[in-house]
Amino acid sequence: RAVLGRYYAKIKDNDLAMLHYSGALEILSEQADPHSAVEVEMLLGQVLSDAGRKEEASEHYLEGLALAEANDFRHLKGELLARLGEVEKDRSQRMEYLQKALSVFRELGANDRMREVQNSVHRVVMGH
């Protein structure tokens, strides 16, 4: 189901992508596979964000973040924090998410991703 969700996201059919990602989440919750569940929460959040449904995207990112933190999936935690920094409306909260993402990526030595997040921080500072 996650593969179908990814396919529909690529062809910009957000409704079908959301349907398949949601189905994949249901299956994964029964199988106790937290890593895949975090990834699907992130993918579902991205589809919702692409569809302009930022608040719903944020909810899925927060669900994924809770799972990532509980299982010490640090790279996924950084990704989710960065994505929360992209969809959050409140400027100070956006900065907080992005700063936390920067810290995680710095600890992991993920320099390319760190630069991307620094660009996001710059956009927030400049008011974009």
Question: What function would you assign to each model-found segment?
Answer:
Residues I11, Q31, A51, N71, ...:
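Structural motif corresponding to the intra-repeat A-B loop/turn of tetratricopeptide repeats
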Residues G23-D33, L62-F73, L102-A110:
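Amphipathic alpha-helical segments of tetratricopeptide repeats
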Residues R6, Q46, E79, R83-E86, ...:
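Residue-level recognition of tetratricopeptide repeat
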Residues F105-H128:
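Terminal, low-structured helical/coil segments at or just beyond the last alpha-helical repeat
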